[in-house]
């Protein structure tokens, strides 16, 4: 009987490469790491924009980049391609997260969804009101939505830093709240920051949607086949005047949550073909052609083991967390502090409004709405979640960062107001993260003390 090949029997270089790859994959899926990478990218942008090399920072993002086909050439700055094209992939992942939660997650049942929905609503309304109280001028008031967003990567990353003592239901509550926040942010962008819409673009976007539906109806499961329809939707939304990144949300919400039906279950196909291949002592060059069909079946079965929404989201997660979002932070967090005139057009009120709304408004809205729903008897706190945990969620929800900066870019045409709003986002998100870490450490200590007392 042949001895099973162990990893140690592999050539040393291959063994080391496989171990390194496995370690890297585990490292990249640690939630706290993506938040740290994002923070480093933002810090680099800030330092660069306030260094003697600040001009090179601005020159880089205004570098023209064009795509062309024949006589057609479309040229835009590198900043545009990051904010309007690459961020579509981020919104694609957001759309798929929403799709999954509606199908089988926290948003799949009304009784489970109502409390995080109420908390998210409070976390949108109260910060917006605080901002508007300080910014009554029409130009500055246009930024009311900037502090309403939550950066899910940062918030979950900070929660992960607090360790395994955090109750699982608390993490689920934060994820549900952040995803609902994403839904609200997408709706806000679509309805309030899309400007005058050109109807001609809707026909192009509709063509892309029809292409997606058509591919799904004929059973095309390869994600690559949907790149072209996605690009058509993106172009259509760009022509309409809506923000083209919404194409990612549309495509994400259309991603199937069930695998393509097969005559055999994928696991049965894998078992059958594996047995067939084992039955051959060796595969000669002449037999290679006969293996083409089994190999195709193996690839299809392996692909359909997971639903498309899970498969694509899992594949894109590292690229978004360690590529798209840090690049967005690098391109947009570089605010020249010395170049901001906080008293021109009362820009300091925009900065103060955003900062206070994130640090004070978010926890006040989240905790207040949750308390109201529980007090009225319409909801109960999830098992294992205390009011201290809800306060922690409220503080972490104040980390607006990526989405808040994104909305600020859409809200303010004035460069000085935009810079002031970005400063408010950076300062407010940093304070919210520090308060969340501080309160979270105290909360975890109390949980451990309580657990120890019961043992």
Swiss-Prot record:
Give the record's GO biological process terms: regulation of pH
Q: Keywords in UniProt for this one?
A: Antiport, Cell inner membrane, Cell membrane, Ion transport, Membrane, Sodium, Sodium transport, Transmembrane, Transmembrane helix, Transport
Q: What chemistry does it catalyse, as a reaction equation? A: Na(+)(in) + 2 H(+)(out) = Na(+)(out) + 2 H(+)(in)
Chain ranges passing through the membrane: 27-47, 53-73, 114-134, 143-163, 172-192, 195-215, 242-262, 320-340, 349-369, 390-410, 424-444
Output the superkingdom of the source species: Bacteria
Primary localisation category = membrane
Q: Name one GO cellular component term.
A: plasma membrane
Q: Which Gene3D superfamilies match?
A: Na+/H+ antiporter like domain
Kindly name one Pfam family recorded for this protein. Answer: Na_H_antiport_1
Instruction: List locations, semicolon-separated.
Output: Cell inner membrane
**Record's keyword annotation contains Cell membrane:** yes
Q: Name one GO molecular function term.
A: sodium:proton antiporter activity
Q: Which family does it belong to?
A: Belongs to the NhaA Na(+)/H(+) (TC 2.A.33) antiporter family.
In UniProt terms, what function does this protein have?
A: Na(+)/H(+) antiporter that extrudes sodium in exchange for external protons.
Q: What is this protein called?
A: Na(+)/H(+) antiporter NhaA
Which species is listed as the source?
Answer: Nitrobacter winogradskyi (strain ATCC 25391 / DSM 10237 / CIP 104748 / NCIMB 11846 / Nb-255)
């Amino acid at each position: 009987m042949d001895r099973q090949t162990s990893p140690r029997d592999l050539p040393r270089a291959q063994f080391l490469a496989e171990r390194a790859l496995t370690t890297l994959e585990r490292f990249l899926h640690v939630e706290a790491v993506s938040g740290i990478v994002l923070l480093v990218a933002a810090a680099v942008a800030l330092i660069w924009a306030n260094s003697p090399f600040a001009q090179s920072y601005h020159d880089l993002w205004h570098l023209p980049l064009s795509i062309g086909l024949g006589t057609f050439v479309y040229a835009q700055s590198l900043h545009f391609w990051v904010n309007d094209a690459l961020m579509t992939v981020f919104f694609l992942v957001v759309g798929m997260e929403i799709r999954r939660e509606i199908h089988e997650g926290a948003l799949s049942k009304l009784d489970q969804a109502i409390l995080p929905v109420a908390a998210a609503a409070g976390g949108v309304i109260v910060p917006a009101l605080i901002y508007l109280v300080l910014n009554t001028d029409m130009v500055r008031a246009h930024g009311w939505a900037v502090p309403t967003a939550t950066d899910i990567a940062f918030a979950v990353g900070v929660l992960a830093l607090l360790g395994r003592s955090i109750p699982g239901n608390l993490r689920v509550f934060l994820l549900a709240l952040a995803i609902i926040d994403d839904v609200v942010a997408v709706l806000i962008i679509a309805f309030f920051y899309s400007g005058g819409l050109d109807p001609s673009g809707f026909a192009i976007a509709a063509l892309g949607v029809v292409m997606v539906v058509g591919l799904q109806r004929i059973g095309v499961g390869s994600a690559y086949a949907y790149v072209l329809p996605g690009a058509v939707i993106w172009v259509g939304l760009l022509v309409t005047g809506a923000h083209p990144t919404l194409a990612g949300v549309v495509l994400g919400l259309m991603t199937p949550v069930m695998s393509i039906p097969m005559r055999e279950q994928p696991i049965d196909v894998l078992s059958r073909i594996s047995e067939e291949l084992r039955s051959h002592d060796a595969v000669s060059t002449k037999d290679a052609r006969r293996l083409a069909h089994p190999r195709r079946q193996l690839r299809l079965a392996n692909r359909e083991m997971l639903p498309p929404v899970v498969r694509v989201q899992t594949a894109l997660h590292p690229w978004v967390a360690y590529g798209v979002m840090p690049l967005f932070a690098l391109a947009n967090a570089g605010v020249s502090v010395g170049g901001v005139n906080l008293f021109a057009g009362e820009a300091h009120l925009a900065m103060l409004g955003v900062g206070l709304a994130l640090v004070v408004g978010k926890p006040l809205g989240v905790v207040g709405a949750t308390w109201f729903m529980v007090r009225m008897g319409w909801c109960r706190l999830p098992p294992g979640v205390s009011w201290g945990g809800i306060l922690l969620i409220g503080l972490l929800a104040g980390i607006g960062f990526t989405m808040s900066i994104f909305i600020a870019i859409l809200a303010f045409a004035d460069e000085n107001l935009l810079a002031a709003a970005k400063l408010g986002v950076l300062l407010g998100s940093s304070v919210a993260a520090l308060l969340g870490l501080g309160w979270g450490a105290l909360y975890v200590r109390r949980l451990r003390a309580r657990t120890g007392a019961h043992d």
